[in-house]
């Protein structure tokens, strides 16, 4: 599992060593739990971090707003160390389960190569390893999905799975 910082420097997050000496002080690393926690980051300057989860591994990250993200194997996750502005935007290639902290004034947006998912506070799973196999499954709350080509947003309700089709439309199933 690697963490790449703004400057391109990569840090290997190793369960056998303490990562607290190699990561910025505000980020609490818990190697034995395979977790990074950004809730203590207080800054008006943000950095972009990239977590790469290899095959056979998984990892949890708690973003600065309290949103919890469980990353599955073969996943890249791009996120800011602090959310600044009117939106909370992250990018995903792979699969992750999100438990989004509620913030009615700042929607949380997950971008993949083919889908954009917009939420205000909810739990959902996104699988987007390839453009041909992109799914968004809603657990709780409400989300809206659209293709990245500017299509209209489609609202999901708990238990629904939105599967992106090659024509840019979604098939909804329960």
Where are these predicted regions, by residue range?
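Short acidic/polar, Gly/Pro-enriched loop/turn segments located at secondary-structure boundaries
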Residues: 1-133, 144-169
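N-terminal periplasmic "start-of-domain" segments of outer-membrane beta-barrel proteins
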Residues: 173-174
């Amino acid at each position: 599992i690697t963490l790449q910082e703004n400057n391109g420097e990569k840090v290997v997050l190793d369960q056998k060593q303490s990562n607290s000496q190699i990561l910025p002080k505000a980020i609490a690393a818990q190697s034995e739990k395979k977790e990074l926690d950004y809730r203590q980051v207080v800054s008006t300057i943000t950095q972009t971090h990239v977590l790469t989860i290899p095959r056979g591994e998984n990892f949890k990250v708690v973003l600065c707003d309290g949103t919890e993200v469980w990353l599955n194997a073969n996943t890249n996750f791009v996120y800011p160390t602090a959310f600044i502005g009117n939106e909370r935007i992250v990018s995903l290639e792979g699969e992750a389960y999100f438990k989004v902290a509620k913030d009615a004034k700042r929607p949380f947006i997950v971008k993949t190569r083919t889908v954009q998912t917009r939420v205000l506070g909810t739990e959902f799973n996104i699988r987007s390893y390839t453009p041909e196999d992109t799914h968004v499954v809603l657990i709780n709350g409400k989300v809206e999905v659209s293709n990245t080509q500017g299509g209209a947003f489609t609202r999901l309700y708990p238990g629904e799975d939105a599967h992106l089709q090659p024509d840019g439309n979604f098939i909804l199933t329960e």
